A protein has these predicted regions:
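Short, low-complexity Pro/Thr/Gly
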Residues: 1-153
Length: 153
C-alpha cells in the first residue's frame, strides 16, 4: 500500500468549497464571494468551544494545528518538528480512500431562527475550491486531487 505524503488542510469539509450560493424561489439570498472557506474557519474558531472542537467538529476534519508549525507541509513529520493537527488529519487521507465528512453550512440563511415556508424551493450550490487550496504536500510538482463521490443535505 502506497502512503502518499499529502495531507488535508484544517476544516477540510469547508475548505473544499470557495463559495456557497443559496437560492430561495430562484432568487439568490447569499452574497457571491469566494471566501466561504475563510468564513467557515473563522466561524468555527470563534463560535465553538474546546469541547465541540475536540468532538463534533472533527467530523469536518477540524483538528487544531500546532502553533508555529502551520508551514510544515509534510504530514509524516513526527514529534515537536511536526504539526499535530496535520498529522491527525493525515490518518484519514494517507490511503487515498473515501472519507465521510459532516458539518453545518455556514451561511446567514441557515443561522436564522425563522422557518422556511412550505413550497418554497431551496437550492444550494457548492462551488469547489482548487485542489491546491485544500491539500498540503511536501513534494513539489505533484498532481494530488480531491474527488467528491456523494453529497447529501
Amino acid at each position: 500500500m502506497l502512503l502518499l505524503k499529502v495531507g488535508v488542510v484544517n476544516n477540510f469539509l469547508h475548505s473544499m468549497f470557495k463559495q456557497v450560493d443559496v437560492f430561495l424561489k430562484e432568487k439568490q439570498v447569499t452574497q457571491a464571494t469566494g471566501t466561504y472557506a475563510y468564513r467557515a474557519y473563522l466561524e468555527t474558531l470563534l463560535n465553538y468551544g474546546p469541547s465541540a472542537k475536540d468532538s463534533q467538529l472533527t467530523a469536518a476534519l477540524f483538528y487544531k494545528d500546532t502553533a508555529g508549525k502551520m508551514d510544515v507541509a509534510n504530514p509524516t513529520t513526527a514529534g515537536d518538528a511536526g504539526n499535530a493537527g496535520l498529522r491527525a488529519r493525515y490518518v484519514f487521507s494517507k490511503t487515498s480512500g473515501i472519507i465521510e465528512l459532516a458539518g453545518p453550512i455556514f451561511s446567514d440563511v441557515f443561522m436564522t431562527e425563522r422557518l422556511l415556508l412550505s413550497y418554497v424551493d431551496l437550492k444550494v450550490i457548492l462551488n469547489r475550491s482548487s485542489n491546491e487550496f485544500c491539500l498540503m504536500a511536501s513534494e513539489d510538482d505533484v498532481d494530488y486531487r480531491v474527488k467528491l463521490s456523494d453529497a447529501y443535505l
